[in-house]
């Protein structure tokens, strides 16, 4: 049915749904907006933390982000600039972040949704790790679990800069 126009769907609803987590004036992001919010946040030293609200299907979820201990990683990507490109192949000490979804709790204190329904970021769930370039905050690596494949690591291959 997803390819049909909405007026032909057999099950559709309209109306307001209360967020199970009260936003209390905080913005509610969609999951890919998290990457921008994390990159802009004051997360610099191991132990620095941040909690953000993320919209997930029909509810909101608190996402906990924490800076992990530093560890060098290998990078191999192309920086594309208006005047040309540069190959970056080296060891770097990125800003390593653990990204975890906390259980969704409704106003009555009851856990909502499927207990096995993890927070998901770009198709990855479980123990998600995000590595950002310490200076530019460019995402260098994202790892987590993917259905069928298990542990998956996505690495930056090309970045377009101005």
Please name every model-derived segment.
Residues 1-28:
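Hydrophobic alpha-helical segments and helix pairs
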Residues 18-64:
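Extracytoplasmic beta-rich ectodomain segments of secreted or membrane-anchored proteins
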Residues 1-8, 48-162:
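Acidic, serine/threonine-rich low-complexity disordered tracts
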């Amino acid at each position: 049915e997803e390819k049909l126009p909405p007026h032909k769907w057999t099950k559709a609803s309209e109306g307001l749904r209360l967020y199970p987590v009260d936003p209390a004036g905080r913005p509610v992001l969609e999951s890919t907006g998290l990457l921008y919010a994390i990159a802009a946040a004051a997360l610099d030293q191991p132990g620095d933390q941040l909690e953000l609200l993320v919209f997930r299907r029909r509810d909101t979820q608190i996402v906990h982000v924490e800076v992990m201990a530093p560890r060098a990683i290998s990078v191999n990507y192309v920086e594309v600039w208006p005047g040309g490109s540069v190959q970056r192949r080296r060891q770097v000490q990125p800003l390593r972040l653990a990204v975890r979804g906390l259980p969704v709790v409704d106003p009555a204190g009851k856990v909502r949704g499927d207990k096995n329904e993890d927070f998901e970021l770009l198709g990855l769930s479980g123990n998600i790790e995000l590595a950002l370039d310490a200076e530019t905050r460019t995402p260098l690596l994202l790892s987590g679990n993917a259905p069928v494949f298990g542990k998956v690591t996505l690495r930056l291959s090309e970045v377009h800069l101005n």
